[in-house]
């Protein structure tokens, strides 16, 4: 990854926004900008240089991973020393991201600088400059994300023979997660969702000791982390033979998902993509059971900008990677969700999770 190039791009955005210096504390942003992946870090971007502050646990790791920034090992607080260094450099102000800064953090930041500099020294941004950069992936990021997405598809296909009536949801999740590790994944993008029978009506129904019923839908929502990037996909399968009503519900969700994928075109808003899915479910009389947004960005983190939701005005541009995941949830009965990762190209959306979306009856 070309971290020096990312820092140069960020500096141009800072200059355009009139920002003299920036304090980055969100760990995913730190990793994006300089490569360091430790659990304690503050990146100070000031006049002409970027400085990474961490603690003694990461002395070796920081040297190995960091590029584009000078590494400093803090004796006490990395955040405090990062702020002190910016104050000592003579900058007039420091901008921070309030979405990743707690009240306790702010107290540490203020205590780090002389009292005569505190007034107006720290300013919060209304938007995250780094999040805006992370929305559009470069060529190397896209390669890594497609590798992660394709691994997820292979894992799903290998898992299908192990899904059966009487098998515990946790067993299915364990099989999936073990296979992910065996195939090179660094971990899972989030807690694996295996929700069967009436539990499928829980949008975030994490795997439990519940046994898969003799008949009904099973929602499988999972992702892997590969080479530092997340994948995310959902497929819904059926145990037994689906009834006409169940098949109609499944086909409606699949049609809604495809309509949203087809709506992914550079220049449209993410809100328009959301509406494409909802309109199909509205015509099918099922829109009231679609209770969440249609999707989100993916990258270093499982949930990134942009949001794909009603009334969102973010314009889609080439290089964005989003999920398209409409679902319906009928309490006490069943749930269905189908999700793909989609890359926005120069002309359309390209699905990078090509596993079958036909109704699979096991």
Which residues fall in each region the model found?
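Active-site neighborhoods and metal-handling regions in enzymes and metal-associated proteins
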Residues: 1-362
């Amino acid at each position: 990854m070309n971290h020096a190039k990312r820092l140069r791009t960020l500096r141009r955005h800072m200059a355009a926004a009139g920002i003299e210096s920036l304090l980055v504390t969100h760990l995913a942003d730190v990793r994006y900008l300089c490569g360091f992946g430790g659990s304690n870090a503050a990146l100070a971007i000031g006049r002409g240089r970027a400085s990474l502050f961490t603690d003694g646990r990461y002395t070796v790791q920081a040297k190995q991973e960091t590029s584009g920034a000078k590494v400093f090992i803090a004796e006490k607080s990395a955040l405090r020393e990062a702020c002190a260094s910016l104050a000592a450099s003579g900058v007039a102000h420091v901008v921070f991201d309030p979405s990743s800064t707690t009240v306790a953090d702010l107290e540490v930041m203020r205590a780090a600088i002389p009292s005569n500099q505190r007034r107006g020294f720290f300013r919060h941004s209304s938007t995250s400059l780094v999040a805006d950069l992370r929305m559009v992936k470069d060529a190397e990021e896209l390669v890594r994300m497609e590798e992660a997405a394709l691994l997820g598809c292979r894992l799903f296909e290998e898992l299908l023979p192990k899904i059966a009536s009487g098998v515990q949801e946790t067993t299915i999740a364990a099989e999936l997660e073990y296979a992910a590790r065996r195939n090179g994944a660094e971990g899972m993008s989030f807690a694996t969702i295996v929700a069967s029978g009436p539990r499928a009506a829980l949008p975030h129904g994490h795997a439990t000791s519940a046994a898969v019923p003799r008949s009904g839908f099973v929602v499988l929502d999972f992702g892997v982390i590969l080479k530092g990037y997340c994948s995310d996909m959902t497929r819904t399968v059926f145990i037994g033979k689906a009834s006409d009503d169940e098949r109609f519900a499944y086909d409606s969700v699949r049609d809604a998902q495809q309509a949203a994928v087809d709506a992914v075109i550079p220049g449209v808003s993410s809100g328009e993509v959301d509406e494409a899915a909802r309109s199909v479910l509205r015509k099918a009389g099922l829109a009231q059971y679609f209770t969440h947004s249609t999707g989100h960005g993916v990258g270093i983190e499982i949930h990134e900008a942009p949001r794909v939701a009603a009334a969102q005005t973010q314009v889609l541009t080439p290089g964005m990677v989003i999920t398209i995941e409409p679902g319906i949830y009928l309490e006490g009965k069943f749930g269905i969700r189908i999700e793909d990762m989609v890359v926005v190209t120069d002309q359309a959306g390209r699905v990078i999770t090509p596993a079958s979306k036909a109704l699979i009856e096991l």
